[in-house]
A protein has these predicted regions:
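Cysteine-nucleophile active-site neighborhood
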Residues: 1-37
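Amide-donor transfer/coupling interface in amidating biosynthetic enzymes
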Residues: 23-135
Length: 135
């Protein structure tokens, strides 16, 4: 499970690339670095692919998330599939097509869950999947 910088690092590990600075590299009307807002605040909406771990977790294709990043996925790494994106097309989630426990999100559920308990389900799902592999 990768979160924010881990999301970006995981993509690079699988051969993907990043936009180094969203404001300079990509035209967008959406705020991706919500530095002036409380960190738990929902900053923008995302769409979730129905055929994804994230959809299994949230049971919804629409979700609002916080946002604290100035880098973003440009080219997706090999063996990864996009599972969530913001309205401007920036990737917000992906998962591996080859490794069932490799998945990642760009937002910060670890900050949001105190205010939005459904965000805790990301961690519950990760623990459940990991625990099932321990013998």
């Amino acid at each position: 499970l990768g979160i924010c910088r881990g999301f970006q690092l995981m993509n690079v590990y699988f051969g993907g690339t990043l936009y180094q600075d969203i404001e300079q590299d990509v035209a967008t009307d959406y705020l991706h670095f919500g530095g002036k807002f409380p960190k738990h605040k929902k900053i923008h909406p995302i769409k979730i692919d129905k055929e994804s771990i994230l959809y299994d977790i949230f049971k919804n294709k629409d979700l609002d998330v916080n946002s604290f990043h100035h880098q973003a996925v440009d080219k997706l790494g090999q063996g990864l599939k996009k599972t969530a994106y913001s309205p401007d097309g920036r990737m917000e989630g992906f998962e591996s097509t080859e490794h069932e426990n490799v998945w990642s999100v760009q937002w910060h559920p670890e900050i949001m869950f105190k205010y939005y308990p459904e965000q805790l389900n990301i961690f519950k799902e990760f623990i459940k999947r990991t625990k099932s592999k321990i013998k």
